[in-house]
Amino acid sequence: MAIERITDNKFELVSKYEPAGDQGEAIAELVDNIENGEKAQILRGATGTGKTYTMSQVIARTGKPTLVMAHNKTLAGQLYSEFKEFFPNNAVEYFVSYYDYYQPEAYVPSSDTYIEKDSSVNDEIDKLRHSATSSLLERNDVIVVASVSCIYGLGSPKEYQDSVVSLRPGQEISRDQLLNDLVGIQFERNDIDFQRGCFRVRGDVVEVFPASRDEHAFRVEFFGDEIDRIREIEVLTGQVLGEVDHLAIFPATHFMTNDDRMEESIAKIEAELEEQLKVFRSEGKLLEAQRLEQRTNYDIEMLREMGYCNGVENYSRHMDGREEGEPPYTLLDFFPDDFMIMIDESHMTMGQVKGMYNGDRARKEMLCNYGFRLPSALDNRPLKREEFESHVHQIVYVSATPGDYEMEQTDTIVEQIIRPTGLLDPVVEVRPMMGQIDDLVGEIHKRAEKNERVFVTTLTKKMSEDLTAYFKEMGIKVKYMHSDIKTLERTEIIRDLRLGVFDVLVGINLLREGIDVPEVSLVAILDADKEGFLRNERGLIQTIGRAARNSEGHVILYSDMAKALDENDPVDKEILDSGYYTEYEGQKYKITRSMKHAMDETARRREIQMAYNEEHGITPQTIKKEIRDLIAITKKTDSGEIEEVDASAMTKKERKALVKKLEKEMQQAASALDFEGAAQLRDMVLELRAMD
């Protein structure tokens, strides 16, 4: 039975802050553009200007159901927590991949190795995914924070909605009919272990535990063949929390199909199987034909008997009634037509949207070619970028450095440059590569005397290692962060840098999440003139931004200045006319286009910020950020003090006990919706296990 979506709920933004700096102008401009029907626009906001708050204000003022996309689970978790705080009275949902571990099905012909799909599902995230889809079908005041997994196939929203079991007191329905209906939407009867997606029966009472809940269930009490009343109960204690007038029970799986559609689907699968077997046999591929026939017939038998089989998603084209090549249903299809999309860190996220389809296609083609899957499995896939675009009603790309794709989509750019703290973008200067290390040593000593920290970025692992060794010889307290360092160690390194255990951090990519240190007053970029990843315009602006959280922020770009430009030389004259040069000690030197654009953009922002501060009498203050002991494994002593534990010095038994304790904390963090904390605890557990 279909349910009607409530359409008159309003977003209610709860915040102790009012828009500050240029947030008010940015909010007004974004809202005006949306109300005037602008399809796409960019919010180009400098680091630390409060873009999430601006996004929240826009959602509240436009009142549209909104999908907020991020490029990884960590960032999505941070955004989800922030939006939950801003909108405590609305439906803020979280939709990311529910796999803690995922090994996709694959075949490697060179070694004749078939790798079966293997995965472990995070029950908490599965609950949140169900909560997201049910909220979208029940109400209009919904914000879903999602990773790129929202463009993967999810099952038909119409089938999902049509399968909802709707119950009201006084409704005529027999108890046995309700039990049949619940089994039909993939609920399991379990009178002993009562958990999500289950129901239990006690005489004339049926208790149902929805897939979107984790603590509360519903008790349906019958009088004959009529529902007497429906109560909400606490699962653990059985305590009655109140009576409800209407209960909508959504399916326990997103992949729903009715009996008639199932028979049609099986007929189509059998027809496709026959067709493909003919192809294989005509090509002399008898092994592939035998393999495909055996595997597919087993799946068909399971579908007939159970309505489900392992890898059922590979038959989703037939189940959904789609034509070959048609895009799958995704989370985007659960939204109403006039919804809004906001893409956070769009320069990263849109690249992922583009890349998902190709990687998936290559793996599946191998499975189809060797008889592990029917060709229709190719239609169980993520959306192509152009298919994603076809779902867009109105979209806001949010980034400090929008990508080429976003810039091609729209000319409407809304800027947010002023930080509420008054902090300015750092001063950027170019210095010669010749003698750069000795020059840098002098700068490091100046910062160390003022108890400030330094980031140094290099191009290669070897250079980082050599530089770190040299700095150590010079008596500088330094550490090197490379890609092999695990999450646990990485966060410990950042904490030690902030505490002053060492003064300089050397690395190649210092743009990862969590590398956010207000104590850093100098960022030195070596080989800044070597174009490429992290030395292009966006990479340079993002790296320069690492010094924007300190009032003394300063950035030095070291570049090749072996030869000064001569305006009498035709080639040099061309460079001078193009503007791609810098002045140093009275001479002009060539710099890259990326360096020039990054420096000009930083200088432009700094000028606007300084003018604003002067007009409003604001003095920039370095951000005061608490140094949390996020990663160091700790335990409370009897006196209540926290004592650090050196895991490497523990016995195997002690480590086992610690793993147990951390797993418990991880579950608690996940239940409290602190997904970033839970992820860090998970990484600790994995690393502790690796020690044994």
UniProtKB/Swiss-Prot annotation:
This protein's record includes keyword Nucleotide-binding: yes
Gene3D superfamilies (UniProt xref): P-loop containing nucleotide triphosphate hydrolases, UVR domain
Pfam family membership, one: UVR
Residue intervals of the Helicase ATP-binding domain: 32-418
Residues annotated to bind ATP: 45-52
Disulfide topology: none
Major location (coarse): cytoplasm
Keywords: ATP-binding, Cytoplasm, DNA damage, DNA excision, DNA repair, Excision nuclease, Nucleotide-binding, SOS response
Motif (Beta-hairpin): 98-121
Keyword ATP-binding recorded: yes
Subcellular location: Cytoplasm
UVR domain boundaries: 656-691
GO BP annotation list: nucleotide-excision repair; SOS response
Gene Ontology annotations for the cellular component aspect, listed alphabetically: cytoplasm; excinuclease repair complex
Domain named Helicase C-terminal: residues: 436-631
PROSITE patterns, A to Z: HELICASE_ATP_BIND_1 (PS51192), HELICASE_CTER (PS51194), UVR (PS50151)
One GO molecular-function entry: excinuclease ABC activity
Family to which this protein belongs: Belongs to the UvrB family.
Job description of the protein: The UvrABC repair system catalyzes the recognition and processing of DNA lesions. A damage recognition complex composed of 2 UvrA and 2 UvrB subunits scans DNA for abnormalities. Upon binding of the UvrA(2)B(2) complex to a putative damaged site, the DNA wraps around one UvrB monomer. DNA wrap is dependent on ATP binding by UvrB and probably causes local melting of the DNA helix, facilitating insertion of UvrB beta-hairpin between the DNA strands. Then UvrB probes one DNA strand for the presence of a lesion.
Assembly mode: Forms a heterotetramer with UvrA during the search for lesions. Interacts with UvrC in an incision complex.
NCBIfam families (alphabetical): PRK05298.1, uvrb
Entry domain remark: The beta-hairpin motif is involved in DNA binding.
Protein name: UvrABC system protein B
Gene: uvrB
